[in-house]
Amino acid sequence: MSYLSSLTRGAACAAALLPVVLLAQDASSVYRAGQLNADQQLARGIYKELVEINTGVTTGNITTAAVAMAKRLREAGIPEADIFVGGPRPEKHNLVARIRGSRGAAAGKPLLLLAHIDVVEALKEDWSPEFDPFTFNEKDGYYYGRGTADDKAMAAIFIANVFRMKREGWVPERDVIIALTADEESGPFNGVDWLLKNHKEKVEAEWVINEGGGGTHRNGKVLFNTVQAAEKVTTNFTLQVTNKGGHSSVPRDDNAITQLADALAKVGRYRFPVHLSDITREFFAKSAAEEEPALGRAMRAIVANPRDPAALRVLSADPRYNSMLRTSCVATELKGGHATNALPQLAEANINCRIYPTETAEQVRDSLRRVIADTGVKVLIRSQRPPSPATKLLDEVMDPIRQITKEMWGDIPVIPTMSTGATDSRFFRALGVPAYGVSGLFSDPAVDARAHGRDERMRVQSFYEGQEFLYRLTKALAGAKRPVSDQ
C-alpha cells in the first residue's frame, strides 16, 4: 500500500472516531519524543534521504537529490507535466514543481517555496569520530549531518507537506511552486540565477519563502521568531602587489609580501562606518528585551543614537552584532612568492567583504584604497553579486507569520532581520519580488551555530515544529479553503 493510501485510510478512521474539528495545536503538542505521526515519519525519511546524498558543491551531485525529490513528488500525485528537473551541467540540476491553484492566474502570481539542496563540503576526518557528515544520525535530541541546518530541513519539509496537503484534498487558490536548487553555497550560479535567466516563467512569483530567518530559544525558553527581509551583499576584492624580485641573499625594502602584509594589517584594523536601516533599527529595538542587560542597553542606545560611543563599543565587541552595524571586510586567502631563495615578484590576498545594502562595491573599493594608502597595492574587484534591496514587510505576508507564530509559541515577538550572509533571496529582491526568510525552525545560537562547520545539526523538536509552521504558512499565503487553524 502506498504511503498516501495508508495515510488516507488512517485519516478516514480518525474522522469517524472524532466528531469534532481539532483546532490549531500549539508547539508543545506538535512533537512528542519517540511518537512521530505518519506525516512526521515521512518528513524524517525524506530528510534522511536528502542528507545522505552528497551534494557538496564540488565533490557531490545535486542532480541525484533533485531526481530523488521529483520521484517523491510524483508519488504525492504531482503530474509529470508540472515537474521540471534541469540545469546547465549534468551534476547541477534543479527541481521546480507546481501545485495548480483552483483560480490560477486570477488569484495572483504563485507562492514560491525555495530551498537549496547543495551543501558546503564536509570531510569525515573533520567531524567527531561518531559522525559521518553524509550519514543521517540522531543523538540526544538532535539530527546530525551535513545540510541538516543549511538547508535540507526546509527542502524536506516542503516535499513532505505536499503529501499532507494532497491527502487532505486541499487545493490552493493561487499556484504554489516548490524550487529545490543548486549552487547557493558557491559556484557559477547554476541554481536560482540560471533559472531566472533561462526559465523565468517557472519561478515567477508574488512572494518567496526562503531560508534566512528562524526562531531563537535560550535555556529552553522561546524568545522570538525572525523574518529575514534584507541581506548584505558579498563582494571579493584582490589586493595585489608586484615587484621585479631578485635573489633572496640581497633583500631590499620593497618586498612584495611585506608590502602586502602591511596593507592587510591596515584592513584588519579598519572599522567601516555604522549604518542603521529600518530593518536593523527594528531588530535592535525588539531584540533588546531578550538580551543580557548590557547588550540590551546598548541596543536601545544605538537605536536612539547610532553614534553613541559606549553602545558602539559594546555591540562592536560582539561579532554577530558588529556585522549587522556595518560593512565588514576580512582576508580569506593569501598567496605569494615562487621560490624559497627568490624575492617575491607577486603577492596577492583575497578580501571578502559583506557590504551593507546602502553601499556599493565601488564605494568599498575606494575605502580600502584610502585605508591602505599605498599606491603600490592594487585593489581590484574580483567578483561581486547584484545589489539586494530590502523586502517590504507586507501585511498580507507578515500578518499570517505573526498569527501562526502566536498560535504555536504564544506572545513572542516576530522580528525582521538583516542577514550578514548571502541567500538566494537576493536574486528575487533584485527583480522587485518580495522574499521572506522564515522557517519556524528554532535554535540556540550559543550551541547550535554549526552550519558549514563540524557536526552540523538540527534540534529534532525544531524540525517538526518547523514542518507544522511552514505547512500552516503555505496554506495561509496560498489561499486555504478552510481557516489556517482548522486542521
Question: Where do the language-model regions lie?
Answer:
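Bacterial N-terminal signal peptides that target proteins for export
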Residues: 1-14
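Stable alpha-helical elements in mature extracytoplasmic
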Residues: 39-47, 61-65, 69, 154, ...
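Acidic/histidine-rich catalytic neighborhood of metal-dependent amide-processing enzymes
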Residues: 142-143, 147-226
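Loop/turn elements at helix/coil->beta-strand transitions in domains of secreted/extracellular proteins
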Residues: 76-81, 107-111, 172-176, 203-206, ...
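Metal-dependent amide/peptide-bond hydrolase catalytic core
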Residues: 25-27, 214-223, 227-230, 234-465, ...
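Solvent-exposed loop/turn segments at secondary-structure junctions
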Residues: 56-58, 90, 102-104, 117-121, ...
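N-terminal signal peptide c-region/cleavage motif recognized by signal peptidases
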Residues: 19-24
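Acidic/His- and Gly-rich active-site-bordering loop/insert found
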Residues: 26-148, 165-174, 351
